[in-house]
Amino acid sequence: MAPQDETLSLAREPLLDAGTGGTSGLAGQLTDAERKRRRRKIAALLAILVVLAIIILLIIRALSGKSPLPSLSPTLPHYVSSIYGVDEPMGVAVSPSGDRIYVTESEGPRLVRVYNGSGNQVGTLKPPGRNDTWHLPVYVAVSPRTEDVYVSDRLRQDVEVYDPSGKYLRAIRPAGRLGKGADPLGLAFGPEGDLYMTDVGGSRQNHRVLVFGGGSQQPLRQLGSRGMFWFPNGLAVDSRGDVYVGDSNDGRLAILDPAGKLGSSIQRGVGEGDLNLPRGVAIDGHGRAFVVDTTAQVVDVYRLPKQVTEVPSYIGSFGTEGIGNGQFRYPNGIAINGSGRIYVTDRENGRVQVWEY
C-alpha cells in the first residue's frame, strides 16, 4: 500500500482507544504497516534465494555432464575474410596448432598451397615424378598426432603423405583384400589416430569407407555394405567414433557407428535442412556438424545427435550463391581449427572463405 493510502486510512481511526486506558491506536497501526513491509522483504529474499539455488543447480548439473547450460554463441557464423590465389580449390585442412592451412587446387599447377594462420602463402606441396601434370589433389587431412599431411590424388589413385615441413614421405596405395582397386577421395582422422578414407573405385557397389592404421598400405577394415554409398566424398569422425559421410550422389549425410552400421541419415529433398549434393563435412568442438551442399551454394549446420540412430537437428545454413563476400559458387571442402574458425573452399570463385562465430 502506498504511503498516501496509509495516511488516509489512519485519519479515519481514533487517536486513543478508550477501552484500554491510553493505548495508542496510531502506534498499533504503524506496527501493522511495518509488519507488512517486513513480510514483503522476507518474501523477496526467499525469491532471490530460490533463483540462486536454481542457478547453482544448473551449474552443478552442467559440470557433471548431465545437462549442459545453453550456449551463448550465435546460431550461425559470420563471414570474416577470404584467401585468394588458388585455382579452383577443392579440399582444405588445418593443422592442430592452427598455424598452417592446406588447400588443394584442381586447376592450374594443381598444387597443395600452404598458408599461415594469417592467410599468407608460405609454401606448396607436390608429389615427386617426371610428369608434372599427372596429379590431381582433391581432399586433404592433417594427422592430429604427427601433423603429417595426407592428400588424396584422383589421377595417381593414392594418398600422398608429407611431413609438417613439406617433405614428401611416401604414398599410400591401398593393397590387400580390402584395398584392391580402391580409388581414394575424402580423408579424415578418427579419435584414435586412424585414417578414414572414402573409396570411389569401380562401380557403385564397391563405394565404401576404408580405415587405415599406422600408415599401413592395407586397410584395417571397411565401413558400409555393398551399394550403401554412391560417390562418397568428404567425411568426419566425432569423439565417439561415429562417422559422418557426405554421400554425394545419394544426396544424403550418412551416419555410421564405429562398426560401420548405418544409424541415421539426412536425405535429399527441398525441405528445411534437406540436402542436394553434399561434399565436405566437418565437426567442431561444440557439438555441431557442418555439411557443404555444393549445388545449393550453402553450408548446412546441424546439432549432433546423442545417439547414432537419431537424426541430427537442423540449426540453419550460411552463404548464398554469388561472387560477393559470404557468397559461394560451388563450394566443396570445409575445415575447422581449434578455436572454431571455419574454412570453406569456394571453387568457382577461386578462394577460401573464412567464417567464425
Protein language model regions, located:
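Conserved beta-propeller blade signature
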Residues: 100-102, 148-150, 194-196, 242-244, ...
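Blade-level signature of beta-propeller repeat domains, shared across WD40, Kelch, NHL, RCC1
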Residues: 329-357
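A short loop-to-beta-strand structural motif that recurs across blades of beta-propeller domains
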Residues: 110-113, 157-161, 207-211, 252-255, ...
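A short beta-strand motif characteristic of beta-propeller blades
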Residues: 78-84, 121-131, 168-177, 218-225, ...
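A short helix->beta-strand "capping" segment at the edge of beta-propeller domains
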Residues: 67-86
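Beta-rich, blade/repeat-based domains predominating
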Residues: 85-97, 130-145, 177-194, 226-240, ...
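Short loop/turn segments immediately following the C-termini of beta-strands
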Residues: 106-107, 154, 200-202, 248, ...
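Short loop/turn segments that connect beta-strands within beta-propeller blades
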Residues: 116-120, 163-167, 213-217, 257-261, ...
